[in-house]
């Protein structure tokens, strides 16, 4: 860690821009509103880039100011998701989420502000992005919802920005989008030396250049060879989970037969019906017959009851008669409590490529998405969204494609039918209606190995370690530093 000498770091050399309490609250509200726009189910990509500026301005001056700024910003940040959280997880868990979000931003803001008093600008500006990235990593590791709710998804409309996820996952995206605002905010709060400002500008410029070159290279690396035709089919005609197979299949089967391409894939949604073991066997037969008739691989999701045990499953039927089942690994708390989770990924070698099978919530979890890295080149994902989160559900899956270098075909009830290439570019996307929604796309059967796919969250864990070490170090060092001349002056005054 770079630590300058005490003489360089005196608070006398760094006059602090101070605001009154009302102005600090207003700045905190502005920062929170920008963060809220980034956390929203339909986010504004530009908002998180600006949020650190008012946040760090409000935090400057004292520890109390930093805690106030972080608390106000964190409380406002969660407001865009409150109605969604209340409907999805209820009051008690929503309150816990709010408290954790507020506490996270208080911690990150306080640590960033304290670092400005002890570190050069080029180092201090890394603290807020790195700390928030560390918190995001810990969240996705311990939360049953994985990386759902991450600020990283705000950038899914800025496809060049999210390419850094192929290097460091969600934490890398968070770090990148908060970095320029952190520089701007700290730049304005103190009277930094000219050399400090130049060093900080050079560092941010180099990081921005590196990220840009990497994104340009990745987005322009075109896969060669043939493609795999994909058909995505879904309808919102049925309410909930139908209790029988025949009526559901009578509606889906004509669309499958009419639209499937020989040698291609057909992906249907999650939970088409709730079936007992015998019904699941009949469903497998019907889907297998459709696969043989069309020459396409057909994937469909059903919930299966075996005596007193329930499973959320995906069925893959191949033209050669193979039938493969996959059990969903990550279940939605409060909505799928009766289901028993699976514990392993499933790969299928077919149509000249290697498929990976996942179901909806699985792809909200980077760890599960990474199980398929370097193995699958195309992910098939039956899904069932909540309607209002259709865009976000699709984009969370899309980011797994960027992280791991595979293409994705996703078909969701109450959501979108969509396909993405290995860089996360949208190939096709359409909202599902009560009518039968059918779209087609062509996916490359060739994946692209990524650093994140091989090494996982190394960057995120580095952020965690550095944030902890910095917090411990700051707790052991007195504040503020006094130069030796100031110490002498203090001793003379004491005499």
Regions found by a protein language model. Name each.
Residues 265, 279-299, 306, 353-354, ...:
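CN hydrolase (nitrilase-like) catalytic-core segments centered on the catalytic cysteine
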Residues 43, 81-85, 136, 230, ...:
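Active-site beta-strand/loop signature of hydrolases that rely on acidic residues for catalysis
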Residues 2-219, 387, 420-423, 427, ...:
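Membrane-embedded alpha-helical bundles of multi-pass enzymes
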Residues 86-93, 138-170, 293, 309-370, ...:
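Active-site catalytic loop in hydrolytic enzyme cores
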Residues 206-260, 389-392, 399-400, 409, ...:
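Non-cytosolic juxtamembrane linkers/loops
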Residues 469-495:
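Juxtamembrane interface at the cytosolic side of transmembrane helices
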Residues 217-334, 348:
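Soluble catalytic regions of membrane-associated enzymes that act on cell-envelope
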């Amino acid at each position: 860690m770079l630590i300058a000498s005490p003489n360089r770091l005196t608070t006398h050399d760094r006059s602090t821009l101070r605001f009154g309490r009302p102005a600090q609250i207003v700045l905190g509200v502005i920062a929170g509103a920008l963060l809220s726009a980034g956390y929203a189910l339909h986010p504004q990509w530009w908002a998180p880039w600006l949020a650190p500026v008012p946040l760090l301005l409000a935090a400057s001056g004292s520890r109390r100011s930093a805690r106030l700024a972080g608390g106000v910003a964190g409380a406002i940040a969660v407001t865009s998701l409150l109605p969604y959280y209340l409907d999805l997880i209820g009051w008690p868990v929503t309150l816990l989420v709010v408290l954790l979000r507020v506490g996270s931003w208080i911690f990150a803001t306080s640590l960033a502000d304290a670092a400005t008093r002890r570190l050069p600008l080029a180092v201090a500006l890394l603290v807020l992005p790195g700390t928030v990235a560390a918190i995001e990593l810990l969240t996705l590791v311990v939360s049953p919802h994985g990386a759902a709710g991450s600020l990283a998804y705000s950038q899914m409309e800025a496809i060049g920005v999210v390419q850094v996820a192929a290097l460091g996952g969600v934490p890398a995206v968070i770090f990148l989008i908060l970095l320029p605002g952190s520089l701007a905010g700290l730049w304005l709060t103190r009277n930094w030396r000219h050399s400090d400002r130049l060093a900080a500008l050079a560092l941010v410029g180099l990081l921005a250049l590196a990220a840009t070159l990497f994104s340009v290279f990745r987005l322009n690396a075109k896969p060669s060879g043939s493609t795999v035709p994909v058909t995505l089919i879904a309808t919102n005609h049925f309410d909930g989970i139908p209790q029988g197979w025949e009526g559901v299949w009578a509606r889906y089967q004509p669309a499958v037969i009419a639209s499937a391409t020989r040698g291609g894939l057909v992906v249907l949604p999650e939970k088409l019906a709730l079936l007992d073991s015998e019904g699941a066997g009949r469903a497998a037969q019907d889907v297998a017959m459709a696969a043989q008739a069309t020459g396409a691989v057909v994937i469909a999701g059903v919930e299966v009851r075996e005596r007193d045990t329930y499973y959320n499953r995906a069925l893959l039927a191949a033209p050669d008669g193979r039938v493969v089942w996959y059990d969903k690994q990550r279940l939605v708390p409060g909505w799928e409590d009766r289901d028993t989770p699976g514990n392993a990924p499933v790969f299928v070698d077919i149509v000249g490529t290697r498929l990976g099978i996942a179901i909806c919530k699985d792809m909200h979890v980077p760890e599960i998405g990474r199980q398929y890295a370097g193995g699958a080149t195309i992910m098939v994902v039956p899904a069932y969204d909540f309607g209002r989160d259709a865009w976000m559900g699709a984009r969370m899956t899309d980011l797994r494609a960027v992280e791991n270098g595979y293409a994705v075909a996703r078909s969701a009830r109450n959501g979108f039918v969509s396909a993405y290439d290995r860089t996360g570019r949208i190939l096709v996307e359409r909202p599902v209606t009560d009518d039968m929604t059918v779209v087609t796309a062509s996916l490359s059967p060739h994946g692209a190995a990524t650093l994140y796919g091989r090494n996982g969250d190394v960057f995120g864990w580095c952020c965690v370690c550095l944030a902890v070490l910095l917090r411990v170090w700051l707790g052991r060092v007195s504040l503020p530093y006094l130069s030796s001349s100031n110490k002498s002056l203090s001793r003379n005054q004491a005499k």
